[in-house]
Swiss-Prot record:
The keyword Lipid biosynthesis does not apply. GO terms for biological process: 'de novo' IMP biosynthetic process. Keywords: ATP-binding, Cytoplasm, Glutamine amidotransferase, Hydrolase, Ligase, Nucleotide-binding, Purine biosynthesis. One of its GO terms (molecular function) is ATP binding. InterPro entries: Class_I_gatase-like, PRibForGlyAmidine_synth_PurQ. Coiled coil: none annotated. Residues 3-222 form the Glutamine amidotransferase type-1 domain. The gene is purQ. This is Phosphoribosylformylglycinamidine synthase subunit PurQ. It is found in: Cytoplasm. It comes from Ruegeria sp. (strain TM1040) (Silicibacter sp.).
Length: 222
């Protein structure tokens, strides 16, 4: 199994995401933002958290125009798997791979803490290691994590069972308490919380491990 983790100027969670993939059995390649192609045979692309390009213009807006993002979009359009975490989620919305946008937190402050997430669906490669309704503890660290989409889009996400996670106690004002969403084919997940920071007992918890193990098991059997 092969994973590629994209690195932008300002990324700061790329190594954490790579380690989480490696611990689940993936062979991981780090891919620079100026590269125009993903490594051959990549099963899943990780778009990590951080502050790509200093969050200028809008979070993820400049990164979405980078050469590697064209390859990431093409990978997703071919049915490839992708995981966008925090800034990675912002980037995936900016590229149009996922609907909606991430706005400034309702409280206008940066938030860094562990929050409770409710697993909204177990019907995806990313969430099949959980049961719908499970509550897991996962860190957040963002200033612009307030998910927004219009009413029709939110209803579509609900009707298609594409809301992956919701906040138990909404920290940032996200519409419908949404913390993470799936693409139409359910092979792309964008989420503001950091599952890679909940993958080591020594770092505060392991509730994110099931996600990476589930991906590993699915792609091994594929």
């Amino acid at each position: 199994m092969k994973a590629a983790v994209v690195v932008f100027p300002g990324s700061n969670c790329d190594r954490d995401l790579a380690v989480a993939f490696e611990q689940a059995g993936f062979d991981v390649s780090m891919v620079w933002h100026k590269d125009s192609e993903l490594p051959e045979g990549v099963d899943i692309v990780g778009v990590p958290g951080g502050f790509s390009y200093g969050d200028y213009l809008r979070c993820g807006a400049i990164a979405a125009q980078s050469p590697i993002c064209k390859a990431v979009v093409a990978h997703a359009e071919r049915g490839g798997y992708a995981l966008g975490v925090c800034n990675g989620f912002q980037i995936l919305t900016e590229t149009g791979v996922l609907p909606g946008a991430l706005l400034r937190n309702a409280g206008l402050k940066y938030i860094c803490k562990t929050v409770d997430l409710a697993v909204a669906t177990s019907d995806s490669a990313f969430t099949q290691g959980y049961n719908a309704g499970d509550v897991i503890g996962v860190p957040i660290a963002h200033h612009d994590g307030n998910y927004y989409a219009d009413d029709a889009t939110v209803q579509m996400l609900k009707d298609q069972d594409r809301v992956a996670f919701t906040y138990v106690d909404n920290p940032n004002g996200s519409v419908a308490d949404i913390a993470g969403i799936l693409s139409e084919n359910r092979r792309v997940l964008g989420m503001m919380p950091h599952p890679e920071r909940a993958a080591d007992e020594g770092h505060g918890g392991t509730d994110g491990v099931a996600m990476f193990r589930a991906l590993s098991g699915l792609l091994t059997d594929a």
